[in-house]
Amino acid sequence: MNHVNKAKELYKQGFYCSQAVFAAFADELGLTEKQALQVGSCFGGGMCKGEVCGACTGALMVLGMKYGRYKADDWDSQMKANDMAIKFLEQFRSENSSYICNELLGCDIATPEGKAYAREQKLFAEFCPKMVASAVEILEQLSK
């Protein structure tokens, strides 16, 4: 199963956007799916506050695992990771108008009213999977 389909399937199962994106890459990152799902569990819904889209934070976790530093003095890796993160966010915003969850959804999901609106409009069921797919597609483009 390719990354896009894996992420969409995980999202469809009920995992957050952040979990779906990050876990779709678990194998190649040397993680179990369980580990990736656990790590991504607090980032969905714009970190539960409608902030940076969880699909984006999941993607940034993938980039951090691929390019980030694990030694304090490895600034080359840190700069590469930062560069990739900036490229990702710029591309995501270019394709989707924003990378802020509330802006993408057009409502404040940190409020009961906003969350109810998102459910009524089927945004979580129909719009968010598109953001998950977009994030994964951009990750794949950047990895070429």
Segments (PLM) and residue ranges:
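Short glycine/serine- and small hydrophobic-enriched flexible loop segments
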Residues: 23-27, 61-68, 137-141
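C-terminal binding/interaction regions
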Residues: 81-144
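Conserved phosphate/anionic-ligand binding catalytic regions in large, soluble enzymes, centered on
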Residues: 47-61
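A short glycine/serine-rich beta->alpha loop
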Residues: 5-12, 42-51, 120-124
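Acidic-glycine-rich active-site phosphate/pyrophosphate-binding loop
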Residues: 22-41, 107-112
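Phosphate-handling active-site elements
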Residues: 28-38, 65-84
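Active-site-proximal helix-loop elements at catalytic-domain edges
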Residues: 1-29
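Short cysteine clusters
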Residues: 17, 53, 101
